From Swiss-Prot:
It holds the Pfam family GHMP_kinases_N. Signal peptide: none annotated. Mg(2+) binds at S109, E141. Belongs to the GHMP kinase family. GalK subfamily. Gene3D superfamilies: 3.30.230.10, GHMP kinase, C-terminal domain. It comes from the Bacteria. Was identified as a high-confidence drug target. Its EC number is 2.7.1.6. HAMAP family: Galactokinase (MF_00246). Pathway: Carbohydrate metabolism; galactose metabolism. It comes from Mycobacterium tuberculosis (strain ATCC 25618 / H37Rv). ATP binds at S50, G103, S104, G105, L106, S107, S108, S109. This is Galactokinase. The record marks R10 as: Transition state stabilizer.
Length: 363
């Protein structure tokens, strides 16, 4: 039986590098999706093809980390995680199509892993709840691919819903829906892809995580979330000033997530926009994960009339989001494109986006 299963990319509205620190984040699922079509066969491997790559990749069912590389490593990681958890995985043919841009900060990797997990589960009739699937996906990305990411991307892809943001508490692993419908207030969410690609399997992401872990160790706690209620004064016990700056971002970002959710409850997109900009400034000054190109896009959007703008995703490239009054959206988009080209960068791809459904079988 052939099955098709789709999983979305995501935009993290606010709450960057907070997930592995057991803090808060507020993502939405995107209308852009990765779809995996899987036909089980009596073979000892899965042959995978992607519309993003030439040729095919052979994934042995007994694959181990490091055996499959490149784009296919994410699919192989999903297979490895499923089998490691005792779930059945048959051989077969797998076809992958996607309109989630790779390296744009929209979590193309989580969309691919989630779609593979869903397709194999649907083909075998295996019922796996969403939280377990998120943990399997994280294990695939952490331990097979080698990207030290948290649960954010996978929870967003699995729990996403139309006109809904997800307030995630990573200490308790709870997901609370928060109404997110800016169009109802004549505000649009602009997604501005810088076309500067990034990769979480690279070293900078891991360095930020290690810095946060050192800061927590200096404070005598297992995660920075444990000192959230103590305020910034607690950071004086952190030995390394760079580690202290990283921790300051995490604590202030957690509060911004909660304040952003409160602003949404009041339909106060002016306040929400200001929090986006404050988040970007914190990522630039304290966490040092933005780039000159990304900063230019965010700052140009605000100067042109956006209520606020910030980089979304793990950093070092990718995309910027902005909340913009609907009647200013075209001017903001034109200004951002012009500013980037004038500075010698590729023209950003600017589009309106919205909160969309999460992962599901394609019927």
């Amino acid at each position: 039986m052939t099955v098709s299963y789709g999983a979305p990319g995501r935009v993290n509205l606010i709450g960057e590098h907070t997930d592995y620190n057991l803090g808060f984040a507020l993502p939405i699922a995107l209308p852009r999706r990765t779809v995996v079509t899987f036909t089980p066969e009596h073979t000892g491997a899965i042959t995978a093809r992607s519309d993003r790559a030439d040729g095919s990749a052979r994934i042995p069912l007994d694959t181990t980390p490091g055996q499959v590389t490149g784009w296919a490593a994410y699919a192989a990681g999903a297979i490895w995680a499923l089998r490691g958890a005792g779930h059945p995985v048959p051989g077969g043919a797998m076809s992958i199509t996607s309109d989630v841009e790779i390296g744009s900060g929209l979590s193309s990797s989580a969309a691919l892993i989630g779609a593979v997990l869903g397709a194999v589960g649907a083909a075998t009739g295996t019922r796996i709840d969403r939280l377990e699937r998120a943990r399997l996906a994280q294990r695939a990305e952490n331990d097979y691919v080698g990207a030290p990411t948290g649960l954010l991307d996978h929870l967003a892809a699995l729990f996403g819903a139309p006109k809904t943001a997800l307030l995630i508490d990573f200490r308790d692993i709870t997901v609370r829906p928060v109404a997110f419908d800016p169009d109802a207030c004549d505000v649009v969410l602009l997604l501005m892809d810088s076309r500067a690609r990034h990769c979480h399997a690279g070293g900078e992401y891991a360095l930020r995580r290690a810095s946060c872990e050192r800061a927590a160790a200096d404070l005598g706690v297992s995660s920075l979330r444990a000192v959230q209620d103590r305020g910034l004064a607690a950071l004086g016990a952190i030995a390394d000033p760079i580690d202290a700056r990283r921790a300051r971002h995490v604590l202030t970002e957690n509060q911004r997530v909660l304040d952003f959710a409160a602003a949404l409850a009041d339909s106060d997109f002016t306040a929400a926009g200001q929090l986006l900009t404050a988040s970007h400034e914190s990522m630039r000054e304290d966490f040092a994960i933005t780039t000159e190109r990304i900063d230019l896009i965010a700052e140009s959007a605000v100067r042109a009339g956006a209520l606020g703008a910030r980089m979304t995703g793990g950093g070092f490239g990718g995309a910027v989001i902005a909340l913009v009054p609907a009647d200013r959206a075209r001017d903001v988009a034109d200004t951002v494109r012009r500013a980037a080209v004038t500075a010698g960068y590729d023209e950003p791809a600017v589009s309106r986006t919205y909160a969309a459904p999460g992962a599901a079988e394609c019927r």
